[in-house]
Regions:
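Acidic/polar, glycine-enriched structural segments that form the non-catalytic walls/loops
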Residues: 1-8, 96-100, 107-308
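C-terminal capping/lid segments that line or modulate ligand- or cofactor-binding pockets
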Residues: 2-53, 312, 320, 363-383, ...
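An extended acidic
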Residues: 4-90, 162-184, 251-260, 264-265
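Solvent-exposed loop and edge beta-strand segments that line ligand/cofactor-binding
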Residues: 24, 28, 255-265, 298-317, ...
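Aromatic-rich carbohydrate-recognition surfaces in CAZymes
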Residues: 120-121, 141-144, 151-156, 160, ...
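Extended ligand-binding clefts on enzyme/binding-domain cores
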Residues: 138, 154-182, 262-271, 366, ...
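Long, well-ordered core segments of solenoidal/helical folds
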Residues: 249, 278-287, 328-351, 392-413, ...
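Structural helix-adjacent loops and short alpha-helical linkers that scaffold large soluble proteins
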Residues: 260-269, 286-289, 324-337, 380-398, ...
Length: 515
């Protein structure tokens, strides 16, 4: 059935994939594409920053005359990488009727993701199945079959899925009604060849001419640009892109200076190397120093969300910054410091989180996210790494410390983003920032003494605010006392209740709240 426009729009409600990722990856170079893998297939792919995904997933259907199978649902695969520090996933899907091998990289020179594929199985054909979510949104996408491949666009952003050997036929439809999976589910084979769909939640599918070859997923601000990038990447050759991908990662790994790494047991050293690579993969390029918390949307498989965890949290960024500092990644550390200075708000605080370009998303205020950048600046000052940023870092620290002094010790939100009050973690970080900023010489003499006095005062009162003794829990555990998670006021934590916003407003005694 070859029809021009697919029926059944706008399609079912758009969602993201699960956050249960197998791995993440990106090239080190001028290419601006990040990928995730989950359940053995390509999940969200981000471009031109690690804040913005443009597809939900790209999976595969394998079919013969009397048989069809979606590899994701079979869920029988193994994933390996060439080494613990080189994010090139090789995925092998096993089935009694077939063996499908995939390898995924991004082109270091272009905004293109490449998949090398090889299918073994008599009388079988391979069908890539792509769900575009242009601009981080599955709604209002437009798609079409073009001579160059499967294309999708929305609001001036375009992608194309092109095949080295081309497609024998292709179709674009609405998810849940006229997409390729529905075609196989209803008819047992590919019978639909819809040439256009949109606006809506789309899925696109094509039958590959060959069972071995290369797919290119390219992104651009124009349809022609995406097609050109895909074609040029395929023409330049997969092996050349892979060689450069591996070379650049190896060169970057040479800059890692983690004391004693080679003396650790192999399982521990591999874990460290993988962790360092994961950190690097979450780093932005258009906005150097930006570090998203996770290339995923934790609740995305149940509903759509524009932000997920692919956002910058100052808290997470500084904690990653200390890890990078421990690994001797000086360039990355300095870039992060400059980025934090740039996104600080005029009154001294940082937004709860933001996209990599600095645009705020959740706009709560958490005092630990105000204090941690000061601790980071103080550490860089101690190690002589601020350089020309010294003046800007001092101005940043002064504004942040003034904000802490004005609004502390209670935080408008605790670090779990539920409630206002005094939290042991936030309070301890705030006290440390006051002392570190003063000791680093970031403050004038009068302000320095005030910061130290305030830190002493909060430190002396910490136990009265967040420590309780001889509660039922303490007696059950045979301990003298414990620190509570949150005290909603400045009175003793032995009294009062907390209404937990992330537990359907359940009310619990302050002294019983842990975490």
């Amino acid at each position: 059935m070859n029809q021009q426009h697919a029926p059944g729009g706008p399609g079912s409600t758009a969602t993201w994939t699960s956050s249960a990722k197998d791995m993440v990856g990106t090239a080190i170079g001028q290419g601006r594409v990040w990928f995730t893998v989950g359940y053995g297939i390509l999940n969200e792919v981000y471009w031109p920053s690690c804040s913005t995904p443009h597809i939900r997933d790209l999976g595969f259907i394998i079919a013969g005359d009397d048989f069809w199978s979606e590899v994701k649902r079979v869920n029988q695969y193994e994933l390996t990488t060439p080494s613990s520090s080189l994010p090139i996933p090789k995925i092998v899907h096993h089935h009694e009727r077939y063996r499908l091998e995939l390898e995924i990289i991004t082109d270091p020179a272009r905004d293109v993701l490449l998949i090398r594929y090889h299918l073994e199985g008599e009388g079988l054909r391979l069908y890539p199945l792509l769900a575009p979510h242009i601009g981080g949104d599955g709604d209002d996408n437009y798609g079409s079959v073009s001579p160059h491949g499967l294309t999708a666009h929305k609001k001036g952003r375009h992608l194309i899925l092109a095949a080295e050997s081309g497609f024998n036929r292709a179709s674009v439809g609405y998810v849940g009604s006229s997409d390729g999976w529905q075609d196989f589910s209803q008819n047992g084979y590919m019978s639909w060849e819809y040439q256009q769909a949109g606006p809506g939640n789309l899925a696109m599918m094509g039958e590959l001419n060959r069972n071995s070859g290369v797919l290119a997923l390219a992104f651009s601000d124009s349809a022609q640009g995406a097609a050109t990038l895909a074609a040029s990447s395929i023409a330049a050759g997969y092996q050349e892109a892979r060689r450069q991908y591996a070379y650049l990662w190896a060169a970057w790994n040479e800059t890692v200076n983690f004391p004693g790494l080679d003396k650790l047991p192999k399982n521990l050293s591999d874990a460290v190397r993988t962790s360092i690579a994961v950190i690097k993969t979450h780093e932005g390029r258009t906005f150097p120093g930006s570090l998203v918390a996770s290339l995923s949307t934790p609740w995305g498989d149940t509903h759509k969300d524009a932000g997920g965890y692919h956002l910058v949290w100052p808290r997470d960024s500084v904690e990653v910054g200390f890890a990078m500092l421990a690994c001797g990644l000086i360039a990355e550390v300095r870039a992060l410091m400059a980025y934090l200075i740039a996104i600080q708000q005029p009154d001294g605080h940082w937004m709860q989180n933001n996209f990599t370009d600095g645009q705020p998303y959740w706009q709560g205020i958490q005092l630990d996210e105000v204090a941690l950048p000061v601790l980071f600046a103080a550490k860089l000052h101690e190690q002589g790494l601020l350089g020309e940023m010294q003046g800007a870092a001092i101005r940043m620290a002064r504004k942040a410390l003034a904000f802490i002094a004005q609004y502390g010790p209670a935080s408008p939100q605790d670090r779990w983003e539920e409630n206002a009050g005094i939290n042991p973690f936030t309070l301890s970080v705030s006290i440390a920032a006051l002392v570190a900023g003063a000791k680093a010489g970031f403050l004038e003499e009068g302000d320095k003494q005030y910061a130290l006095d305030l830190a002493d005062d909060w430190n002396e009162r910490l136990e009265s605010w967040v420590y309780v003794k001889d509660t039922k829990l303490d007696r059950e555990l045979g301990i003298d006392g414990h620190y509570v998670r949150l005290n909603p006021n400045s009175h003793s934590a032995r009294f009062g209740d907390v209404m937990l916003r992330n537990r359907n407003n359940e009310t619990i005694s302050t002294r019983a709240l842990l975490g």
